[in-house]
Amino acid sequence: MPSSLLVRSFIAVSFFSFCFAVAAQPPGPGRGSGQGSADRGDRGDRGQGRFGEAMPLRTAGLEKRPGLLDTWFDRKTGKVWLVLPPVDKTGVVGSYLYEEGILTGVGSNPVGLDRGQIGDARVVTLRRVGGRLLLEEPNLRFRALSQDAAELTAVRESFATSVLWAGEIVETEPKGHEAVDFTSFLVRDAHNVTARLKQAGQGNWSFDPGRSAVDFANSLSFPENLEFESVLTYQSQEPGELIRQTAPSAEAVTLVQHQSFLRLPDIGKDGYHPRAFDPRAGSFPVEFLNYAAPLGEPIETKWISRHRLEKVDPKAERSRVKNPLVYYIDPGAPEPVRSALMEGVSWWKEAFDKAGFIDAFRVELLPPGASPMDARFNVVQWVHRSTRGWSYGGGITDPRTGEMLQGHVTLGSLRIRQDRLIFEGLAGADKTGSGAPDDPIQISLSRIRQLAAHEVGHSLGLSHNFAASTYGRASVMDYPAPQVDITPQGDLDFSHAYAKGLGAWDLFAIKWAYTEFPPGTDEKAALDAMLRDAIAHGLIFLTDQDARPPGAANPKAVLWDNGSDPVESLRHEMEVRRIGLAHFGEHNIAPGQPLALLQEVLVPLYLHHRYQLDAALKVVGGLDYSYALRGDGQPPAKPVDGDRQRAALTAVLDTMTPAALDLPDPVIALLLPRPAEYRPNIEMFHNQTNPAFDPLGAAAAAADLAVDGLLQPERAARLVDFHRRDAKLPGLEEVLAALVDRSFGGQAQETARQAELRRVVQWVVVRRLIGLADDRDASSGVRARVEGTLRALRGRLAPAAPGAHTADPTDPLDPETEQHAFLAAEITHALEHTDRDPAKHPLPPAAPPGQPIGEAPMFLPEGLSGCSWGD
């Protein structure tokens, strides 16, 4: 997600008195061409300039590159010299926007160091202190929006700053220009790669300056920005497994680091105007504490993140803009993906047009040789990893105001292949490449269009809206599940799998964030009126905090779901799953492929219902709420109706019956052991029958999705509290009783085949009940009720315990009796053991990962959304 950087001014002047100009340069054509030009950026000449005349011995043979700050490049020594203009009376050279990132990546999704990854944008000030130049980051988390110098000084002196680097000033010429060796700033671990590798469990790493250098050929100078690249090497004696899988020599990881300095944009009367954040509108904020706020107002201040769009005619309802937004697509994306990306990104043109901006948004290919790290480009990068991974959108944001200066999007290339795998499981690989509505490639291209639009939406300042799927397909900022219909003949219909274009929420969110009102308009009142109208038309907004936690409460906020009725939608997806499994066979992989690969294709089909299951789970102990503001007329929070909760509970329990979990023998017969050099991977079910496929392990993983979801401690606590306040709502006791009865009842009507599946479910239920009883984060009321359920269940199973039978003790017990004896012993051990540590409890096998099929990485640098928050 975009960073929540907080802001204050560094020197004792009003916040709005920062002096800067718009950083808007036409894109340059070349990267690595070795030729300087006005557009390209100056690569320098070897002649003598003003500084060279003052210091002929130091600059002889060096390349001078004029720009935002003049630089001299010494190819012989590998050094970069920064030439500074005269300082002011406080010693300040100037303030700039600083951005760092990595041009090249490690290529491992769990590690998280991806090609084109950027970090936070920071305001930095260059100032002279004695004989040293300090590069200092002001503490922009705290500030005073005031014209009073004393007020500003009080805030400035109350909080620490951060000096990021210091260098010796080696010589001062008579005119006041100074030089400093800037090499050590450029050749350092600015992206904190060593810490990130350690955090990812890849061992201890150190930066090796002896194998690192500034890349002169790809360091550019422009009037509004400086771009520096350095080749950096990191070393380790014990590299982790993920590095061994991706680096050619695991003990050395070499990356290209990119650092940018930008002229600060103008703000205030003739520049960018921040817009106040509203939690109902779906924009990302920057946040700060304003110590000059009146006593009757909060000091917490939030402004939205957005690009600057200025109308040529500010008074016109519709007008062209001074500087249109141009997004450049990575030409490294192959066709037909490239065209799909361009089409999906171009959908945003409609939103800006409806917000009153004519031709304000367009999409082009990145010019040949141009660097995607150049801060002048809004870019959509196509990034490869060794395994499928996240996509995310963000960019360079001015932390003082929220103005977005560059949109930067990363799209994982294996995402579309995972989509194709999903649809080959549903439709069959024989349809691949046919061009028909059920062609997995065509369906996947439809999804990649939405993914591109989604991530660019983040880079325009928009958050996820996970409620949009409940009122139509209303937003690309949701995570869209494919809509698979069922024909009257019982076949699967993919013709409406994904929507095309933006939804109603997207159009509103851009209009609210970007509309420029005519002079004299009460902006606050106008924006509030827009929100009231949107709410009246059913456009609600719920985001990550409401959707992602396993114990989340609002059934409207769900990832990868469809429809306004979670229960009915779950039943539909279970029927889609049943039809898909009934037709599953050799045709689900391409001719000539090993049949063993059907195991990977089976996983997303067998777990097809997993996200709609999450939607139904949120109905149980669910709470309907919105981001209401006082006076906006939205209703207060209310628990979900009891009948709806009970219907959802029934639908959830239906997903873990033996009939739902069983796989047909013809399918199991095709799931062959792995051939030579086809190693098991995380896309397969956990296996306890190796080398044979483990259908009982798959059943345990699928059942656990439901059981673990029901027994989340937050959901259990809500059930206790909601029932306390309204006896018509189901309580935790009712849910626990239903779970136990459905798991331990019905054996008389089952075949031996089905009974074994039920015993798998019983073990999952007992393990999860024990885990919740010992969960120290669960409330005492929850733990007491769960422990009571376990004691009652042990009593129910007790007749099967050893010693309860009068038959010959050498006679084997039947499987049901053995199971009950085993589970009773498990419960006894758990309840009576003195060290009730949940971490020591064995858990059911985890299902293979559903995500990443979107954004949300395990690790994301500040400044990116992600989309662990998503695509």
Predicted regions and their residues:
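Auxiliary tRNA-acceptor-end handling modules of aminoacyl-tRNA synthetases
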Residues: 26-333, 351, 360, 365-418, ...
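The catalytic-center signature of Zn2+-dependent metalloproteases
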Residues: 30, 51, 365-384, 446-502
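Sec-exported extracytoplasmic/periplasmic mature domains
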Residues: 346-357, 385, 457-458, 482, ...
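Conserved catalytic/binding loops enriched for acidic/polar residues
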Residues: 471-871
